[in-house]
Amino acid sequence: MIKYTEYKYHLAALFTVTVWGATFVSTKVLIANSLTPAEIFLLRFAMAYVCILPFARGRMWAANLRDELLLAAAGLSGGSLYFLTENMALEYAPASNVSLIVCTAPVWTAVLLSLLYRGERMTRRQAVGSALAFAGMVLVVLNGRFVLRLSPRGDMLALSAALLWMVYSLVIKRIGGRYPAVFITRKVFFYGLLTI
């Protein structure tokens, strides 16, 4: 029997995935209605920053300059550059292409982690699970209709976004355990806004 708290977390995860999945289509609609990728990013991060402020009071800065620079790198790679390249990709490529390519970010991250850290090797079980999850996501996105619509500029921008997310993941791995998640998230929003 699932406990109430577990149920709450599952609902929160489902809500998060739904919102994340809707961003590709909603961004495409906003671009079609004359908003630029930078404007979309600015609106998204400004709203997120304002929403997180009540939960992230207290500490304003990291404990040292090195950590503050890592937080700035996270805001740049996982904030402004990631979302700008993703939003720009949606100007040139269908949302289905962009979402599929961006969803390869965990694979790139796992590959790089296995090259950089000996203890981070992907097991066969994880590789099979990742492949099955990706195949399932492809089936959902394509909805049973496979139409190959290449858009080199958009597809390369989407791949750039996936690789930027890989960099962001590595930066967060280096700093993750030293600060509360809400502090890190607020700083990522802050530096993302600052570097737009």
In which residue ranges do the predicted regions lie?
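Specific transmembrane alpha-helical segments of multi-pass solute transporters/efflux pumps
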Residues: V19, T23-F24, L53-V102, M137-L139
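Structural motif at transmembrane-helix junctions in multi-pass transporters
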Residues: A32-E39, L84-T104, G177-V182
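Alpha-helical transmembrane segments of compact multi-pass small-molecule transporters, enriched
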Residues: L11, T18, T23, M47-C51, ...
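Hydrophobic/aromatic residues within transmembrane alpha-helices
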Residues: L30, I40, R44, A89, ...
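Glycine-/small-residue-enriched transmembrane alpha-helix faces in small-molecule transporters
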Residues: M1-E39, L76, L148-R174, V182-F183, ...
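Loop-to-transmembrane alpha-helix entry segments
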Residues: N64-L70, S99-V102, R118-L139, L148-D155
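Hydrophobic transmembrane alpha-helices of multi-pass small-molecule transport proteins
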Residues: I52, A72, T104, V111-L112, ...
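Hydrophobic core positions of alpha-helical segments in small-molecule transporters
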Residues: F15, L43, A74, I101-T104, ...
